[in-house]
Amino acid sequence: MNKFKNIAVYGGGSFGTSLASLAAQNCNNVTLFLRDEAIAKEILHNKTNIKYLGDIKLPAHLQATTNLDIIKDFELIIIAVPSYAFDDSIKLLKTHSISKDNTLLIATKGFARNPTALFSDRLKTLLPHSPTAFFAGPNLAKELAKNLPASASIASLDIDIANKIAYNLSAKIFTTNVSSDIVTLQVAGALKNIFAIKSGIDLARKQGENARATLIVAALKEIAILSQALGGMQKNSDILLEVGVVGDLVLTCYSLGSRNTKFGYELGISSDKKKFLQEYKELVEGREALKLVLDLIKKYNLHMPVISKVASCVIPYVIPAKAGIQHKAR
């Protein structure tokens, strides 16, 4: 199978930098595109990104730049930006001549906004001719950057594209599987952060490990409910058992290294929850995704009690846990 001659990663945070480090294991021409000139120079000269990854050393041949004019020359472009920045990022790349010659791998988790939609649906409008795939897995950024064992699922409507990307990213310490179910992988990636908030709340309330295991089962059911409503899981439910779904879900819910679990835990132990929510400034993807998922629950009249329970803890005046009708998983 052919290798990509070069790979770009757009997004210089912890996850983007770690993905660039991963890609550089198999490709000698990898460039990280970011906005911060100082961090770009640090990566070029010191091979570190202290702000996001501490003193972890990055591959010697990894390049970094703020010059987007050259990104169109890269065969594979990995998008690793926060969900709130997704639309603007794609629009910006479009102004720099991204085309059908560039394959996109979306590593961003969440939903597109205004209106709420899957990233794949938004890309049909913004970049309809670019080959696209989606990336998800139990991948803590610092562990990836340290080359510790990990795995990921890669989904694309074009299974040949998924296989090519998997071939280019796979290594002895990094395994991949492929799927054509892009909907379920995206839904799981967005919802996992909300379930992690619930896991943190339960941890703060000392609900025990039994409750956390039960949460995982309930979470998988609700992922299936929303996925089916959005057109996923048309052939089978095997995707739920892949690392990009249950693997990512378990890691996010069980690790206090997860911002979302940490947020849920701190919310759970807070004596003044209203004040805590008003003053909490750190980005929590699950908190942002929650508002968008509620729109989808209402639109499709779904029964997702765990999501609704988290909403009742985080957002005032939301639908109660019993709202909606039962949408059974097939």
Swiss-Prot record:
GO terms for cellular component: cytosol. GO terms for biological process: carbohydrate metabolic process; glycerol-3-phosphate biosynthetic process; glycerol-3-phosphate catabolic process; glycerophospholipid metabolic process; phospholipid biosynthetic process. It is found in: Cytoplasm. Pfam families: NAD_Gly3P_dh_C, NAD_Gly3P_dh_N. Coiled coil: none annotated. PROSITE patterns: NAD_G3PDH (PS00957). Keywords: Cytoplasm, Lipid biosynthesis, Lipid metabolism, NAD, NADP, Nucleotide-binding, Oxidoreductase, Phospholipid biosynthesis, Phospholipid metabolism. The active site is at K192 (proton acceptor). InterPro entries: 6-PGluconate_DH-like_C_sf, 6PGD_dom2, G3P_DH_NAD-dep, G3P_DH_NAD-dep_C, G3P_DH_NAD-dep_N, NAD(P)-bd_dom_sf. One of its GO terms (molecular function) is NAD binding. Sn-glycerol 3-phosphate binds at K109, G137, K192, D248, S258, R259, N260. Its EC number is 1.1.1.94. It catalyses: sn-glycerol 3-phosphate + NAD(+) = dihydroxyacetone phosphate + NADH + H(+); sn-glycerol 3-phosphate + NADP(+) = dihydroxyacetone phosphate + NADPH + H(+). Belongs to the NAD-dependent glycerol-3-phosphate dehydrogenase family. Catalyzes the reduction of the glycolytic intermediate dihydroxyacetone phosphate (DHAP) to sn-glycerol 3-phosphate (G3P), the key precursor for phospholipid synthesis. PANTHER family: GLYCEROL-3-PHOSPHATE DEHYDROGENASE (PTHR11728), GLYCEROL-3-PHOSPHATE DEHYDROGENASE [NAD(+)] 2, CHLOROPLASTIC (PTHR11728:SF1). This is Glycerol-3-phosphate dehydrogenase [NAD(P)+]. The lineage of its organism: Bacteria, Pseudomonadati, Pseudomonadota, Alphaproteobacteria, Rickettsiales.
